[in-house]
Amino acid sequence: MLKEYRTVKEVVGPLMLVDQVDGVSFDELVEIELHNGEKRRGKVLEINKDKAMVQLFEGSAGINLKGAKVKFLGKPLELGVSEDMLGRVFDGLGNPKDGGPKIIPDKKLDINGIPINPVARNYPDEFIQTGVSAIDGLNTLVRGQKLPVFSGSGLPHAELAAQIARQAKVLNSDSKFAVVFAAIGTTFEEAQYFIDDFTKTGAIDRAVLFINLANDPAIERIATPRMALTAAEYLAFEKGMHVLVIMTDITNYCEALREVSAARKEVPGRRGYPGYLYTDLSTLYERAGRILGKEGSITQIPILTMPEDDKTHPIPDLTGYITEGQIILSRELYKKGIMPPIDVLPSLSRLKDKGIGKGKTREDHADTMNQLFSAYAQGKQAKELSVILGESALSDTDKLYAKFADAFEEEYVSQGFTTNRTIEETLNLGWKLLTILPKSELKRIRDEYLEKYLSKAEESK
């Protein structure tokens, strides 16, 4: 029999203090009944002797200290999971948002998940084709990896996220592929864009969407990515699917953490964020991976907007420590009309060498990638030099490198948000661009690959 408490002592913002409690545990789900019969939910955030601090999911407006009844339900916040979730849209707390019926769950799972034993982890080494050349060719995504996208306010990260969700697939695998998409603190227009894009392209059939709007309570924002990851773990490790989890925008999640931390009067850390921000983010990112003996996997692409495009801001800074690289969107490329505006030089995938090569992509992938990086870097350097000294100061070779850099941005990086390139098309395009340079400059590619692929590229020009 659940006890009912009428000892609400204080309500401050999204927090409520309940006095004289007994047998209450951390993270326990709470039901609050208002004087008018309305029911709201919360969870236990802190326990101090006979006092419990409760975090409210639906806000505190209208709560009467004397009339409110509080029940501690003896279980954490859970998500009912089933394969029927595919093709559906939910709110940030896992309730259907698309007008469809409630899901009849196979089971209910704690949204906080269970840490993966490091010894049980399998190493990520399978290529995932996103259809985006700047990622597939140069900063390869590998199954089980966590690869964030660092964006800026106003840059088209939403379009890139939708494109990857539509196009991503594991090559040479018969296993089912699913996408779990979590929109955190998004505007109504952006949420509708995602829903419409998934529906029109048919991507909704293999996807689960969790949408938390900007006007939803901050507490719901903290639960939304955990809801998405719980659904992903079920599909991956119990149904054997390859699951790609895309979470946007992690910055909104961190702002919600800061809001709750301030309401609790905690000592702030860097820029007002709680001191446990690193630990909290790791509880999200570390739920990606592969497990020995399990066919399925979870690959993560968290997307965050860097305040003032600052890479040293605590959110991108700490995210970079936990994840395995970063894809950086450039405002300069965006102004040039390069879409998607991925800046390949500061971008990095730390596991890219594990997912490429013979039997995975193509034998020449690593050499081509190294040569493209080198040539583009030299081309940018030549262009910067011409701005300072004038084009006449450049050697003939420097001019070719500058020409290569322009062609690389316009043809390789820029492909729009609807073009889906195979890895073969991406690699062949790289070879085609390298024909701009003299053969003597292609020092990072083995002779056998030059003989095999360069002549083909020259013929196709």
From Swiss-Prot:
Keywords per UniProt? ATP synthesis, Hydrogen ion transport, Ion transport, Transport
What molecular functions are annotated in GO for this chain? Answer: ATP binding; proton-transporting ATP synthase activity, rotational mechanism
Name the coiled-coil region(s).
Answer: none
* CDD domains in the cross-refs: ATP-synt_V_A-type_beta_C, ATP-synt_V_A-type_beta_N, V_A-ATPase_B
Gene Ontology BP terms: proton motive force-driven plasma membrane ATP synthesis
What NCBIfam families does the entry give?
PRK04196.1 (NF003235)
* Family recorded in the similarity comment: Belongs to the ATPase alpha/beta chains family.
PANTHER family, per this entry?
V-TYPE PROTON ATPASE SUBUNIT B
What exactly does this protein do? Produces ATP from ADP in the presence of a proton gradient across the membrane. The V-type beta chain is a regulatory subunit.
**Stated name of the protein:** V-type ATP synthase beta chain
Q: Which organism is it from?
A: Clostridium botulinum (strain Langeland / NCTC 10281 / Type F)
